[in-house]
């Protein structure tokens, strides 16, 4: 995860201090890219321990097309609590756009199902894309999508994924995003009969909140460990049938967790 630490250092040392929607203030850069070889290990940060349970359950929640936090809370995941209304609703966020994008003619488009079909039928297609950025519904969302578009690419039987993230909370959010989309790529590769390739993470506004500077400096003082390995139940051949128990993280040695406040 040296590439992540390089991003952290780059923003701390060369970023521009700016105001932001939350009122906290950020130091940011515009335009940056990282690449992870998924055959070299699972890109889960080792310079601070991450809550993998939350990452996996959130991804399964997205794939369910769910937009209410009740299912997450049933499984001990609270990462969306601050944005939900009293009934637990978040509006038409990620899961809704991925699985039920509303078309002008009244249909609802299942982008994930379409993607899986195209990977098998047209593996050379340049249209292997899923978008969560729906301008018509942004105002109805509790939080507009930060990781808003991803595309797949198949080469010599290997599946790679590139994510475009318009807004990136480097200290808290980005480590989750890396692991989540790496895992999604592995899952789709498995059910499509492919090997994994690279995960490419492309950023628009990549920022550190001003109340994360000390934590970032502390994290940079730590020496990263070898990447762990993610084992996925090979019996699962349907993307929508995965359960939490189908994933096993091996050899994860991480430094202790570093607390930091969430900007709402």
From Swiss-Prot:
Signal peptide: none annotated. It is found in: Cytoplasm. Keywords: Cytoplasm, Methyltransferase, Nucleotide biosynthesis, Transferase. It comes from the Bacteria. SUPFAM superfamilies: Thymidylate synthase/dCMP hydroxymethylase (SSF55831). Homodimer. This is Thymidylate synthase. It comes from Bartonella tribocorum (strain CIP 105476 / IBS 506). The lineage of its organism: Bacteria, Pseudomonadati, Pseudomonadota, Alphaproteobacteria, Hyphomicrobiales.
């Amino acid at each position: 995860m040296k590439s992540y630490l390089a991003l952290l250092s780059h923003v701390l040392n060369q970023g521009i201090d700016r105001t932001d929607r939350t009122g906290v203030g950020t130091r940011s850069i515009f335009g940056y890219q990282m690449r992870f070889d998924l055959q070299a290990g699972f890109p889960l940060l080792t310079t601070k321990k991450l809550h993998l349970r939350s990452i996996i359950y959130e991804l399964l929640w997205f794939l369910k097309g769910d937009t209410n936090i009740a299912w997450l809370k049933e499984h001990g995941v609270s990462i969306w609590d601050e944005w939900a209304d009293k009934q637990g609703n978040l509006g038409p966020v990620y899961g809704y756009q991925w699985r039920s994008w509303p078309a002008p003619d009244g249909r609802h488009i299942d982008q994930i199902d379409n993607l899986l079909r195209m990977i098998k039928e047209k593996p050379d297609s340049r249209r292997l894309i899923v978008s969560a950025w729906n301008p018509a519904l942004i105002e109805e969302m509790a939080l507009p999508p930060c990781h808003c578009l991803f595309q797949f690419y198949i080469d010599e039987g290997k599946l790679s994924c590139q994510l475009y993230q318009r807004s990136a909370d480097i200290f808290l959010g980005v480590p989750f995003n890396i692991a989540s989309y790496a895992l999604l790529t592995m899952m789709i590769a498995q059910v499509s009969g492919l090997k994994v390739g690279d995960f490419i993470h492309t950023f628009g506004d990549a920022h550190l909140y001003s109340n994360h500077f000390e934590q970032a400096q502390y994290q940079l003082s730590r020496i990263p460990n070898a990447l762990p390995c993610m084992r996925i139940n090979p019996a699962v051949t349907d993307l929508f049938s995965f359960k939490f128990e189908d994933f096993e993280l091996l050899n994860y040695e991480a430094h202790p967790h570093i607390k930091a406040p969430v900007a709402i």
